[in-house]
């Protein structure tokens, strides 16, 4: 087993501070803790990606963790904007939401979400999803991966 030495760059998009903190704490269990950026809604996420991220010449996030139901701009709209943008479309997006409604799940996958996890989340399942996404997308992961 090989462990990368580069920390993941993760963008958490969630209007609930308690949920965002829980997600951040779950990420901290990685071999190399990630660089985490948090924003409270979809509009802030797109502003961040365009100002701080790809368009500013800074490395794009390795992973976006996205809530669906937020003020100003919800997760569905953010996901659509990300997937329509040639500079952002390759970033894996995991939907993390309290909704287990079939239309939300199907809609997220139809919008090309990389994964869908309901909150409250099982930490082992969350870690497995993050590891799998890093293997699948070829990111230099901070979590253990097989060589």
Residue ranges of model-derived segments:
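Short, glycine/charged-rich "phosphate-handling" switch motifs in NTP-dependent
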Residues: 114
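Receiver (REC) domain active-site loop signature in two-component systems and cognate sites
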Residues: 68-73
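Non-catalytic signal-transmission and effector/linker regions of two-component phosphorelay proteins
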Residues: 1-11, 18-35, 43, 50, ...
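Active-site residues of response regulator receiver
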Residues: 67, 97
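Negatively charged, flexible loop motifs adjacent to catalytic sites
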Residues: 87, 99-103
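Conserved phosphotransfer cores of two-component systems
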Residues: 53-59, 83-90, 111
């Amino acid at each position: 087993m090989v462990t990368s030495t580069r920390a993941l760059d993760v963008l958490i998009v969630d209007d609930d501070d308690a949920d965002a903190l829980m997600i951040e704490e779950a990420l901290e269990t990685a071999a190399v803790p990630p660089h985490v950026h948090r924003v409270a809604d979809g509009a802030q996420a797109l502003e961040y990606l365009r100002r701080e991220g790809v368009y500013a010449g800074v490395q794009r996030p390795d992973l976006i963790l996205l809530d669906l139901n937020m003020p100003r701009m919800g997760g569905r709209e953010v996901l659509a904007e990300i997937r329509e943008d040639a500079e952002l479309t390759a970033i894996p997006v995991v939907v993390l939401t309290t909704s287990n409604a079939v239309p939300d799940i199907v809609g997220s996958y139809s919008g090309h979400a990389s994964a869908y996890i309901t909150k409250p989340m099982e930490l082992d399942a969350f870690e497995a999803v993050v590891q799998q996404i890093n293997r699948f997308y070829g990111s230099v992961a901070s979590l253990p991966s097989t060589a």
